Amino acid sequence: MADVIVSNVPGSFPWGVLHERHPALIARVRDATPYGPGRREALDALLGEIDGAIGPLAPGAADRGVWEAWGSEKYVGRPWDEVPFLWAESYFYRRLLDAVGYFGPGPWRGIDPFAPFKAAELDGLAPPVAGLEEQALLHASLWGNRADLGFRISAGEAGLGERVTGLVADDSAGLWAVLDRGAPGRLCVVADNAGPELLPDLLLADQLLAAHRVSEVLLHVKPYPYYVSDATPADVIACLRRAGEAGKRLWQAMADGRLIVRAHPFSCAPLPYQDMPDDLRADFGSATLTIMKGDLNYRRLVGDRHWAATTPYATVTGYFPGPVAALRTLKSEVVVGLDEATVAALDAGGQSWRTAGTHALIQV
């Protein structure tokens, strides 16, 4: 078993997330919303804590018991960079919600601190293109979380150009083969980002439902704001309102029970999917195929460990209760399922291919 990734190596990607990305995010959140002195002081306190020991959740937190089961009793009080990177990163976002009063009494309860960023991305989207084939929609869904780099859904295969060439693994044929095996069944989609990524996810769901390639789509989103742009139920509704005729069809599909939105607490857990609870395991086990979207879900699917890139995908996902596909733009160091020649060619160009968002994969 490969070692769990921690963030204690200066200059490493995890270290940069903890010591550079998180402080920058606190500053952005502080500036994006007119929080009062108390909330600003709490944000400043969280910023000061990053170089020290992990603090506890706010007194009276309703989910304290849940986080204790997820490891807080073991990790609170220890330095941030000495605990598993996945755990520290997830817990940071939970603590950020405490700092802005998301769960507490007062005017900021339930106010998404990332809403200004999500709204700006959604407002910048071009109108959805009608009539795209499933393969084009699949690639649009894959590359959607590069929207911060200026990528947009484009019409037809020609518009995919550069994006397709960045694939380090492409088992899209295997994905369609699994989906078309037997009678149309349930497709589970574990969403990643809102806005530019969620919209093509929904357009793909609409196309598959309309073509009767699936009988229903179960869309898993986050129960509360998480990792800045991760999709919540509110983000689903916002996208449907921007999706034109497809949005109207999906709105009706939700009313009919053919599109089901679920926000399971484990979606925000700081743990790999190997530790999923039984009810979530039953959800995935009932599906013809589960599609895991994005970088974080990939890390949770295969395990946030120092795997050799040639480790077989099937080996590290063998625990999953049904067929599972990963659609992911590479934005962290974890990757498996590549052949030696591909790894050698990519490494020859430097290590940034793992983290720069310039490459992607489709694995089944």
Each PLM stretch: what is its role?
Residues 1-186, 363-364:
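Non-catalytic accessory regions outside enzyme or core folds
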Residues 6, 221-223, 229-364:
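C-terminal functional extensions of proteins
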Residues 186, 214-218, 323:
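Residues at the starts of beta-strands that form the adenosine-phosphate
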Residues 16, 86, 169, 198-202, ...:
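Conserved structured core elements
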Residues 83-87, 190-199, 224-226, 295-300:
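Gly/Ser/Thr-rich loops at beta-strand to alpha-helix junctions
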Residues 196-218:
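Histidine-anchored nucleotide/phosphate-binding helix
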Residues 186-188, 288-289:
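Structural motif
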Residues 178, 204-211, 279, 283:
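Catalytic-core regions built around general acid/base machinery
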